[in-house]
Structures are given as C-alpha cells and as structure tokens.
Design a protein with these regions (language model features):
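Short acidic, hydrophobic short linear motifs in intrinsically disordered regions
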Residues: 330-351
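Active-site region of the double-stranded beta-helix
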Residues: 2-21, 34-180, 188-236, 372
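Long, charge-rich alpha-helical interaction segments
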Residues: 218-276
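Acidic, low-complexity/disordered tracts enriched in E/D and polar residues
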Residues: 261-337, 360, 371-377
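Short amphipathic alpha-helical interaction segments
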Residues: 350-364
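Fe(II)/2-oxoglutarate
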Residues: 1-27, 321-330, 364, 369-376
Length: 377
C-alpha cells in the first residue's frame, strides 16, 4: 500500500487561511478531501493486530447504556454491537496512515504525534469527549455522524480525567463519508457514532504542550544537566537568640539553586531537546557501524530518518531524538534537507570526514537508516 496521499485543503481553503481562522479556534468539516480508495481494512486483519503484544489497543463498548473499556493485547477479541476497537500509533503499522499523516505538511513535524485507528460496529464510538490537542478525523470506510459542541476550555478543566462521557449541547452535526475530514480544535466536545459495521476512522493527533507539561519537562531537563560544581551549603549566620529562624544565607542558597536558569542558550537547548523527544515507547535498534564499512559504499543510496525519529532545527542547531548534534557549517545544507524531507541521497564513499563522523553515530544509534521501513499493512 504505497499510495501517495493528497489532502485537498486548497479546494476549500488555503493552509494559511486555515491556520489563521480555524487552527486551535473552531471546527471545520471538509468533504471529499482525499481519495481513500485502496486503503480498506478487514475485520480479520484488524483483530489480528489487536492480539499483538507489541501493539497498543483497546476496545470501547456500550452495553446497557454504560461504557466499558478493555485493554489489549487480546487472546480473543470480544466485539459486538456498539463497539470500537482502537489501535494507537497506526502510522507505524499501516503505510497508508503514515502517508496520510505526512501529507499534513503545513503543521511542523515537532507537533506531529500519532494516528489512532478506530474500527467500529454500528452504533460504536468512544463516547462524547473533549481533547487537549488538535485532531483531524479522517473517515476511511463506512459512515459516521459527528455532533460538535462549542469550544469551552473551562468545561474541559472541570470534567473527569479522561474527559469521556462529557455532556454537551451539539451546535453542529456532520455526516462523514469515506474521504471526508473533520478538524476539531482543543477543548471542543465531539461525539462520533458509526452508522455501519466495519466503520474506520483515522484520528490524526498533534502535540499541544501545556504549560504544566513544559515546566515538568524543563525540571527534568535541568536535573539531567547535573551541575558539576556540586556546591554545598556551609555559610551559617550566627544568631543565638532565634534558633528556629532559617538563616538568610541558607534561604539565599536554596533560592539560588531552585531558580530557573535565565541563560537563553540553556532555554533554547531545552526547546530543541523537548520538541525532538521521541514518542513514548519508541525503540531504536543499535548497530555496530565502522568508518571503513561506511566509506566502502560507493553507490548513491537513500538515507532515511528512522520512522520513529523526531528531528528538528532550532536557532541553527540540529536536534534528533532529544540530542543536540554538532553539524559543521559545510554540512548544514545536507542536514537541513534530511530533517525537512526525512530522506536524502548520499554516496558514502564521497562524504567528507565531518559528515561521516555524524552519520556513523546516527546510524549506530538507529536514528537513521538505509533501509526502508517495513509496514505490517
């Protein structure tokens, strides 16, 4: 399934107008946005994936008016009416989903998260809910009716942890057919119900880091930096009459060591590391690559980013999987193309020494590869 995907947003609205008017602000329904033919999924194939212990899956079923969720892997998939089987990171499994995700190229790679596939029976869905991120809901097969409510950040804060079974008054309703796309911004309640069996919806999710997430990640980043000075407090103030009083010198020492660094170089480095952090659960197979073996390759080959690699550029620095890699000035154009296009042609035997050094490290870590990713579907 190597079909190239073209999301025809331009038929409805330009990417710049979409970002200005809709992204993060209001829902948008796009009819006949893509050609979905050739991407059909069968129940046997999807159920087989749900039995795989390396694939995250769950079933949401509505029985007697109540929602029940069970988590995979499943020895036997129990799937009846009003049920949905969800498979996460489907873009690593399904080539069509991967191409679909990559086609939304007006959103920076650093905000790409994953594609979740839902396979529903008639009446199935995940229940009314609201998300803290932007999502494109692509109808793959079958039909689904969507009810959309008004965007309400305050309501999102006060609902349950998973924000499911959210009660809201629909303000819009859409009937999604194969090839249709519904964009839903954060904090916007929505509820989709399948109108047929074997109904497939691809949920393309994007990262929307919260202020709390950024602060927590920044603290972890600072902890990982490990201040090599290893200063100890040893400057007591002498005050015999108020022994319960915390010494000013101790309070000052603590303030000094708990204040966030204001060095812009540190903050910029954190931004690059944070936004290139690979998806949770990403796995990279290390290899033993030698310089001699690399330089012996005297034919032009396609070098690719590992499908799980996150690579970003920030303030002229290159970050890959939360690592800042040194790139010589003469190699910058090479890495700009690799990071932006996710692949590049290279003849290793003709590569200069500085480029070879970085290539060997990245190949050894499994961050880049000469091999094309093998999709299961």
């Amino acid at each position: 399934m190597t079909k190239n995907i073209s999301i025809n947003l331009l038929k409805h609205i330009s990417p710049s107008a979409f970002l200005e008017k809709y992204w993060g602000k209001q829902a948008l329904f796009l009819q006949d946005a893509i050609d979905i033919s050739g991407a059909e999924l069968s129940k046997d194939v999807v159920f087989g994936l749900a039995k795989n212990e390396n694939i995250e899956s769950k079933i949401i079923a509505f029985i007697g008016g109540s929602q029940q969720t069970t988590y995979g892997p499943f020895n036997k998939v129990k799937y009846g009416k009003s049920s949905s089987l969800l498979i996460h990171q489907f873009n690593l499994i399904h080539e069509f989903s991967y191409n679909l995700f990559q086609s939304i190229n007006f959103v920076p790679y650093c905000l790409h998260d994953d594609v979740m596939m839902s396979f529903s029976s008639e009446g199935g869905g995940v229940g009314p809910h609201s998300d803290s991120y932007d999502v494109f809901l692509v109808q793959g097969q079958g039909e689904k009716v969507w009810n959309i409510g008004a965007t309400d950040k305050k309501a999102f804060k006060t609902t349950s942890t998973d924000h499911s079974n959210l009660k809201f008054t629909p303000t819009e309703q859409f009937l999604a057919k194969p090839g249709d796309i519904l964009y839903v911004p954060p904090f916007t309640p929505h509820h989709g119900i399948s109108l047929s069996d074997d109904c497939v919806t691809y949920s393309i999710g994007f990262r929307s880091p919260s202020n709390n997430e950024i602060r927590n990640q920044y603290l972890e980043y600072l902890m990982d930096r490990k201040d090599k000075s290893n200063d100890l407090f040893n400057g007591l103030d002498l005050n015999e009459n108020t022994k319960a009083l915390i010494p000013n010198s101790l309070a000052s020492f603590i303030k000094k060591n708990t204040a966030f660094p204001k060095n812009p170089l540190i903050i910029d480095d954190f931004i690059g590391c944070f936004l290139s952090e690979p998806h949770e659960g990403a796995f990279f197979t290390k290899k033993n690559i030698t310089k001699n073996a690399f330089k012996k390759i005297d034919i032009e080959k396609i070098l690719r980013l590992n499908i799980q690699t996150r690579a970003v550029i920030h303030n002229e620095n290159f970050y890959i999987n939360a690592e800042n890699i040194f790139v010589a000035n003469k190699d910058r154009m090479f890495f700009e193309e690799l990071f932006n296009q996710k692949k590049i042609l290279i003849t290793p035997s003709k590569a200069n020494d500085s480029l070879v050094e970085v290539m060997i490290y990245l190949l050894s870590e499994g961050y880049i590869t000469f091999n094309k990713h093998r999709f299961m579907l």
